Regions:
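Bacterial lipoprotein signal-peptidase II cleavage site
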Residues: 25-36
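Hinge/cleft segment of the Venus flytrap/periplasmic-binding protein
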Residues: 37-78, 232, 325, 329-393
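Extracytoplasmic "Venus flytrap"
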Residues: 39-97, 101, 110-122, 127, ...
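Flexible loop/hinge segments that line or gate small-molecule binding clefts
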Residues: 44, 144-145, 150-188, 206, ...
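An alpha-beta-alpha
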Residues: 80, 84, 98, 189-242, ...
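Hydrophobic alpha-helical segments within soluble ligand-binding/sensing domains
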Residues: 121, 180-207, 220, 253-257, ...
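Periplasmic-binding protein-like
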Residues: 132-141, 160-165, 208-209, 267-277, ...
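Hydrophobic alpha-helical
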Residues: 141-156, 225, 245-311
Length: 393
């Protein structure tokens, strides 16, 4: 939570970092939906100044925080089974980053594509256990608790089980047999979305935040966003609404468009539609346009999928995307699996950084495909290979 004192501290840190950089350069509606506008302990001007400093810092390259170095030789000859839907481009990037990391250490990755089917997930776990995998990864954001029986079977077979992006760093899901859920800090994502809305509107943002409760990370984002708005923007007004993955009988795309459209029509002062994920903003954007508000309502989300990065570059109602390096996440997962094999303490919080992308800072980027090294300015995998595993000099 970015409460008033934390906002001020972070803003001061951001200002110092920016000054140092400059010197270097010189060298569906839910009944529980609520409007947040009270309880602020921060003046409007100080909240805006702090938010602008946070946005400026978060628009730079995320700094890598190296976990403790260790000997990865125990990975040689091991096999990991990855169970999950790999049709989504971002999920494929996680797979390929982890594959690259394990291959560098002599381990092999086998992928079982479930295409999003629950029965296929179960079949994949059964095959991995029967195949005596050295580790199993639930790699598409489904919560491990949904497959608690399979996780327990893996534990009984002596196979460590990992999941991705269903918890919060240092707030692990309670599932018997789950070694670790490796995740972004989604509350921090929400905080950054809020800081951007505050800074962009000079502390007068009005709008709606849309979450999908079936996806735990979207709720974490909403929590971070709401706390910042309530604590640090006395003149901001946001509603918090929910859509189910099925949209209550309609498609998810129709549900998202409907929430955006009805929010604007019910409150003509709406100027921001924030979705937990940028893929959802693609559909919410159609609702904005249906409401005739494409020229005044701004959208933002998380994930930096290629279509939204292209929308940023072209100049559309989608105005900001929070990105978390996918290579970093894939390597952080691979690192923890190898720590498990080596008997090392696992790293619950890999401290994966974020970067804010806008129309201004994407103009020189190739947005036809995601390239983390270009987009973030760093090859995060090289840090692991060199500084953590000692494979490169």
């Amino acid at each position: 939570m970015l409460n008033s004192s934390r906002l001020t501290t972070i803003a001061a840190t951001a200002t110092a970092l920016l000054a140092a950089a400059a010197l270097t350069a010189c060298g569906s509606d839910d009944p529980s939906s609520a409007t947040a506008a009270s309880g602020s302990t921060t003046s409007s001007s100080s909240g805006v100044d702090a938010a602008k400093a946070i946005v400026a810092e978060a628009s730079e390259t995320p700094r890598f925080v190296a976990p403790p170095a260790f000997d990865t030789s125990s990975a040689r000859g091991k096999t990991v089974w990855w169970i999950g839907n790999v049709e989504d481009p971002i999920l494929r990037q996680w797979v390929e980053a982890a594959r690259e990391a394990w291959a560098a250490n002599g381990a092999e990755l086998r992928v079982y594509d479930t295409k999003g089917s629950i029965p296929e997930h179960v079949k994949g776990f059964d095959l991995a256990i029967a195949g005596k995998a050295d580790a199993i990864v639930l790699g598409d954001g489904f919560p491990a608790v949904q497959f608690a029986a399979q996780v327990k079977r893996a534990k009984n077979a002596g196979i460590p089980f990992f999941s991705l992006v269903t918890g919060q760093p240092r707030e692990q899901p309670s599932v018997d047999g789950l070694a670790l859920d490796v995740s972004y800090d989604y509350r921090r994502v929400g905080e950054l979305l809020a800081a951007w809305a505050i800074a962009d509107s000079d502390g007068k943002a009005q709008g709606v935040f849309i979450e999908t409760p079936a996806i735990p990370s979207s709720t974490f984002e909403r929590e971070g966003f709401q706390r910042v708005i309530e604590a640090d923007c006395p003149d901001c007004r946001f509603e918090y609404k929910q859509v189910e993955q099925t949209g209550g009988g309609a498609s998810a795309s129709d549900a998202l468009a409907n929430v955006a459209r009805t929010s604007i029509l019910s409150n003509p002062q709406t100027s921001y539609v924030i979705t937990a994920f940028d893929s959802q903003a693609l559909y919410a954007m159609s609702g904005v346009q249906q409401a005739g508000a494409g020229q005044r309502v701004k959208l933002a989300g998380f994930n930096t999928i290629v279509p939204q990065m292209q929308n940023l570059k072209k100049g559309t109602p989608f105005k900001m995307d929070v990105g978390g390096p996918n290579v970093w996440l894939g390597y952080a997962l691979a690192d923890n699996v190898m720590r498990q094999w080596a008997g090392e303490e696992l790293v619950e919080d890999p401290q994966i950084g974020f970067k804010l992308f806008t129309e201004e800072n994407v103009q020189d980027l190739n947005v036809d495909r995601e390239d983390d090294t270009e987009w973030y300015g760093v090859d995060y995998g090289s840090y692991y290979r060199r500084d953590v595993w000692g494979l490169e000099k």
